[in-house]
């Protein structure tokens, strides 16, 4: 009974908070209109002018308009229409914030809409948008601190849902491509792993240095060496597990760190660039096995980029940890001498 009461109180507090957030943000949106008037049209154009003036990296998502100035934005009819679309999206997100199910569903729909238009943006762009949107609103009206915090809250929850849904979509695309890459004890599965290493040794000779006594192997040598039968299955299993866990960010990151520690235990130290190159060669390997559409290539690039980032981060932490241990040993040695 007590648990039910506590749950009811928590639900009430969350609902009241969401209602207040919605109320504050909707009030500020009175200065960013959505209708057919010239004033509303200019409100939308002004948002894009602010974006193009202050966030030039975002221009690349507007094909053939990458070099636009604020004046170009003002004179292009595209932004009159697009400005109303983006403001409408902000109004809907704000209006539905106290209905989290609808808010999340609309957030996912916005991401899917961008995907259908072949516009793929990294997660940080969605976060940056709310910063620029708050700056834009600040030019239209005075935003007090509670209103700023309310927009921060909406932006944070929006970005969280985008990231969650985006990870599901990436996982789905990549898992589909792995249907053509069996792992197991069959001859086909064994050959899949060997083929990956043959591609590596043929096209990325610098990576051979990680294979002691096999640095001068040809693709034919790889084919004949039983080592690559077993190792091929290991590396493909790792790729399957990375893909399968991608929609669970914490598990994905933990598994990347486990892979790095496994290499360290084996005395294999690879330069950061190798981790980036691996995903490039893996995509090429998949392309040989089955045609990859652009969506799938992009999805693998997303996984590869995040993997490489985590691998590099782990390497830095490992190095710092070793240096700390060295300093500790030095201090201990000094104390022993005294």
From Swiss-Prot:
Alphabetically ordered keywords of this record: Glycoprotein, Heme, Iron, Metal-binding, Oxygen transport, Repeat, Secreted, Signal, Transport
Keyword Acetylation: no
Location(s) in or outside the cell: Secreted, Extracellular space
Domain Globin: 25-167, 174-316
Keyword Zinc-finger on entry: no
Gene Ontology molecular function, alphabetical: heme binding; metal ion binding; oxygen binding; oxygen carrier activity
Pfam families: Globin (PF00042)
Cellular component terms per the entry's GO annotation: extracellular region
Main localization (coarse): secreted
Signal peptide: 1-18
Residue segments, region Disordered: 313-338
Residues binding heme b: 82, 114, 231, 263
Residues carrying a glycan: 19, 216
Source domain of life: Eukaryota
Function: Has an extremely high oxygen affinity. In a vacuum, it takes several minutes to release its oxygen compared to milliseconds for a normal globin. Could be used as an oxygen scavenger for sterol biosynthesis.
Subunit structure: Homooctamer.
Comment field on protein domains: Consists of two tandemly linked globin-like sequences which each bind a heme group and a C-terminal extension which may act as a cement between the eight subunits.
Family: Belongs to the globin family.
Protein name: Extracellular globin
Species this chain originates from: Ascaris suum (Pig roundworm)
